[in-house]
């Protein structure tokens, strides 16, 4: 009895596959042209990569690592001094 029930369940679970559309149905709203999508993505990635390299190498993007930030007006005293942590 269990084998018959299992066979029936497997048949019913696979039944919707028989009614499925063909994968190459180009009129289906769920058909995607994956090759064109991949080529377009690679072109976009190449253009963005080239633009990033050009921006990094250009003279207009100068980073000044030698300057100290002007945020701090002076050196602040340490909050914990030696000997102040005793109770």
Curated annotation (Swiss-Prot):
Modification comment: Glutathionylated.
GO terms for biological process, alphabetical = chloride transport; positive regulation of sodium ion export across plasma membrane; potassium ion transport; sodium ion transport
Q: Which UniProt keywords apply?
A: Cell membrane, Glutathionylation, Ion transport, Membrane, Potassium, Potassium transport, Signal, Sodium, Sodium transport, Sodium/potassium transport, Transmembrane, Transmembrane helix, Transport
Which residue spans belong to the Cytoplasmic compartment? 60-87
Give the consequence of mutating residue 61 to S.
Abolishes glutathionylation but does not affect interaction with ATP1B1
Primary localization: membrane
Quote a single Gene Ontology cellular component term: plasma membrane
Record-linked Gene3D superfamilies = Single helix bin
* Protein's recorded name: FXYD domain-containing ion transport regulator 3
Q: Which organism is it from?
A: Homo sapiens (Human)
- Gene coding for it: FXYD3
């Amino acid at each position: 009895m269990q084998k018959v029930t299992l066979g029936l369940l497997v048949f019913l679970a696979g039944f919707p596959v028989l009614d499925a559309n063909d994968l190459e149905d180009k009129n289906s709203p769920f058909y995607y042209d994956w090759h064109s999508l991949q080529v377009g993505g690679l072109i976009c990635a190449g253009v963005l990569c080239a633009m990033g390299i050009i921006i990094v190498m250009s003279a207009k993007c100068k980073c000044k690592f030698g300057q100290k930030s002007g945020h701090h007006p002076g050196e602040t005293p340490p909050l914990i001094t030696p000997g102040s942590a005793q109770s």
